[in-house]
């Protein structure tokens, strides 16, 4: 593959990652080169597709290299009478369009791995515009017995980029947002504090977060080595001041398993079930639409049976609707002293979380949903306000809320670079539950996209 083809492929991947099926951060800005220009000499895009990102702004026939100064800018032409000779011929554009179509037919291993240019932050826009532009995707309720496309195919290409802040109001619950501030100002003066590790790591990761405390974490994906392209290792760290971090958990996918099965441990050097730091596991059904989180209990034991920590259900998409994933998370309920209700599907005397949810027995369980993203007509994409914690568009980006209070964000997860993701959580989740929910987002789902 030549230099031109490689550049066109990179531009195509950047466009594909910004497709309407992905969720972008709403607190970033997109430049509008055609706004405010109503004269005869206004600038128009010469290309309506990936070519506009790699063409020179001075010479439309020149292709910029990766190291060219000026960054990524759309090629433009001047429509004034004095500059009519600068118009590109229709045949040249058609030839380049054919070349783009030929290159785009090749699939890459991970179409979300190429970087996305981040635009600097600017002031917020009116929240009324966001309200009028909402376009949620229909929710499908079946989750277990249908086959569809895999995790990385059949996504439309659309010209979109990170957008400016949407002016999302703060949460009425404790007057707090996920940036730890009140009223959404981001000044850190709210009543919510940032959490720190208390006691031993193995005990801390299983304890529910105290009310009024926010834990800001980071997940890194290690794909180096012989087989880590298919079986990467994920590391969870608690972020601290001045770039410091504290290791909490590590997770990896088991190789010899009929379904997706992740081992989670607080020992980064030994990610096995027999390790002293083994904390639990995440197991999916055969379609990858339903995941169950277990602790490190013994399935056969009657004294300390294995407990259910969470169930994650992804809605199937057999009709091929374009839009973000829809997910439901079911957690054990909380007691008056802020401890989890013990539920075990391994105990024959009681029902598991999934069985209780199917029977609509909600007495001892809590149901969460991903927050519905807002459709932005300007960028032709779905956006959410991550308060600066997420910088790249991805189908994996999500926020979890309860239907009774959609402004209280229990957990949020999103991409910041190719193999780095932020994960923030608060009451009633613990680190183990939040990390397992994030791991389920990484796993391929043959019936969800």
Curated annotation (Swiss-Prot):
Gene3D superfamilies reported in the protein's UniProt record: Tubby Protein, Chain A (3.20.90.10)
GO CC, one annotated term: ciliary membrane
Chief site of localization: cytoplasm
Entry-annotated residues carrying Phosphoserine: 142
Native organism: Drosophila ananassae
Membrane topology: Peripheral membrane protein
Subcellular location per the Swiss-Prot or TrEMBL entry: Cytoplasm; Nucleus; Cell projection, Cilium membrane; Cell projection, Rhabdomere
Protein name as it appears in the record: Protein king tubby
Lineage: Eukaryota, Metazoa, Ecdysozoa, Arthropoda, Hexapoda
């Amino acid at each position: 593959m030549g230099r031109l083809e490689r550049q066109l492929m990179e531009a195509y991947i950047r466009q594909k990652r910004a497709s309407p099926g992905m969720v972008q951060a709403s607190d970033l800005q997109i430049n509008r080169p055609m706004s405010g220009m109503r004269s005869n000499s206004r600038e128009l895009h010469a290309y309506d597709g990936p070519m506009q990102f790699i063409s020179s702004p001075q010479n439309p026939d020149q292709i910029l290299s990766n190291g060219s100064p000026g960054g990524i800018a759309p090629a433009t032409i001047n429509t004034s009478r004095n500059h009519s000779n600068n118009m590109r011929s229709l045949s040249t554009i058609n030839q380049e369009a054919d070349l783009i179509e030929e290159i785009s037919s090749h699939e890459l291993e991970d179409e979300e791995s190429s970087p996305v240019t981040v635009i600097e932050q600017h002031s917020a826009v009116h929240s009324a515009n966001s309200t009028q532009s909402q376009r949620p995707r229909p929710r499908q309720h079946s989750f277990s017995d249908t086959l569809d496309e895999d995790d990385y195919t059949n996504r439309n290409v659309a010209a979109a980029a990170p957008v400016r802040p949407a002016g999302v109001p703060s949460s009425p619950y404790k007057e707090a947002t996920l940036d730890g501030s009140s009223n959404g100002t981001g000044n850190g003066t709210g009543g919510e504090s940032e959490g720190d590790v208390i006691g031993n790591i193995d005990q801390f990761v299983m304890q529910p977060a105290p009310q009024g405390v926010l834990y800001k974490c980071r997940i890194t994906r290690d794909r180096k080595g012989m087989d880590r392209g298919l079986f990467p290792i994920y590391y969870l760290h608690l972020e601290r001041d001045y770039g410091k971090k504290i290791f909490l958990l590590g997770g990896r996918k088991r190789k010899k398993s009929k379904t997706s099965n992740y081992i989670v441990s607080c020992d980064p050097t030994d990610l096995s079930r027999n390790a002293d730091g083994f904390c639990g596991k995440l197991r999916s059904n055969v379609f990858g639409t339903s995941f169950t989180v277990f602790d490190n209990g013994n399935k056969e034991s009657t004294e300390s049976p294995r407990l259910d920590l969470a169930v994650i259900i992804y809605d199937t998409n057999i009709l091929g609707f374009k839009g973000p994933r829809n997910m439901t998370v079911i957690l054990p309920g909380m007691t008056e002293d802020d401890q989890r209700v013990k539920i075990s599907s391994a105990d024959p005397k009681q029902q598991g979380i999934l069985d209780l949810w199917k029977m609509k027995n909600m007495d001892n369980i809590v149901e969460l949903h991903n927050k519905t993203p807002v459709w932005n007509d300007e960028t032709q994409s779905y956006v959410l306000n991550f308060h600066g914690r997420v910088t790249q568009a991805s189908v994996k980006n999500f926020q979890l809320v309860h239907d009774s209070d959609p402004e209280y964000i229990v957990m949020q997860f999103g991409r910041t670079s190719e193999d780095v993701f932020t994960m923030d959580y608060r009451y009633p989740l613990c680190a183990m539950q939040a990390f397992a929910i994030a791991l389920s987002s990484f796993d391929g789902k043959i019936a969800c996209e």
